[in-house]
Amino acid sequence: MSVTVNKPLSLAKELFLSIALVAQEISSDTVKEMKKDFGESVIRNSVIRILTNKGYIQKIGERSEYGYVLTGDGYDYVRIKMPDKFPYLIFRAPTHIYDRVRRVKRRQMSLVLYHLYREGVAFDHHLTELDAMINGEPAEIKEPFFVTQREISQSSTQLNTAYGTRFFGVIVTQTKIIIVYAPSKDKNLYARTESGFYQSITCAFSAATPPFNLPTNIEYIYFYQTDEDMMDSFSEKGKRNVHTASTYRTYCNSRLKQSYIYRMNGNTFRLSDILDTDKRKAIDAVFSEYYEVQPRAVSHLKDVHVCGFYRNTDIPVFMLWDLSPSALVSAIDYTRQPGFGIDGKVYLMCFEEDADLIAEILNTDRQLAKHFAICDLPYQEVMQYINGEIARID
């Protein structure tokens, strides 16, 4: 195989090949998203057609289920063109490229990787930094990065329980570790398995450099491809049978931990809004100022997600602008605790663009929904206010 090493790859081609390598397949949905950003002609002609004609990729599947995988020559091509970018031995070409179960997860991974790229989260070679962190060595984290399930299992034998779950990897920021899941309507999480995996994560990072050794700095994010998948995750089906897959029960088990939902079909907030601690606090402050939320007393430990109380009342306020499933489950549990009256109220703070979605989740139980009031603000106006572009939010 003859390859011109010095000729740089275009951004579109480099990204396409990188995702195909790391995810093991690039799905039709990911291709569609790339066409939106780079242009139909660029992806179809300058990327897919050229790589196919040279024998570097091959198409598998049919119709909406199609995807592209690297060939043996394609794998060698990526190693030559980007020699230091990935731990290539970990991402050797799959031997079961037509296995349907494996394909579902690989295709989902490719879409997650593309959204991470859009949000400025790198997914190239960071295994060395992760190893250093786990071993307690100093690690300078300049920008958020993503490390895949495959890399993590190679890094620590304590994390082998990652296999068989909807766990995809972790996002590492300057202050925290965020466990990445991508469940769906057909692939719910097993609460017991995920609880065990969380214990493995906390154990593995117990000797890490501060602040990564603190369990409070380990969080969750759930990537959903459709709103239907997200809505279904709040279904209480199988709630009483611990052997049944139930993402809702997983939410309940992690109720006291910080978590977020990212909608890949059109997320309202940016990933940086939750990864950047200062930005997150700024958004919380805007909602608190606008709706006159009084901060809770330090001694109020009933629920970590109660951020305060509305004006001078005893109405609890929950921040839900990050679509936190643990906060929503906590808010629901709040209405079921002893002493909560039939006329009791709970306020949920969210972005205007997500208000209908949250209301739809709550309306699955009419008796429950009557206890909630949704307080919303437009995302763009909140950002403009934080950036000093407008003096106030109308």
Regions found by a protein language model. Name each.
Residues 1-16, 98-103:
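Short alpha-helical segments that sit at the start of domains
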Residues 19-23:
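Short helix-to-turn junction characteristic of helix-turn-helix DNA-binding domains
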Residues 24-35:
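Short acidic, hydrophobic short linear motifs in intrinsically disordered regions
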Residues 37-53, 59:
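Short amphipathic alpha-helical interaction segments
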Residues 49, 58-90:
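Accessory beta->alpha helical hairpin/"wing" motif in late/C-terminal subdomains of nucleic-acid enzymes
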Residues 57-59, 122-127, 288-298:
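Short secondary-structure junctions
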Residues 93-199, 203-206:
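Exposed, interaction-prone assembly regions rather than primary DNA-binding/catalytic cores
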Residues 180-189, 201-214, 218-394:
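Long, compositionally biased intrinsically disordered regions
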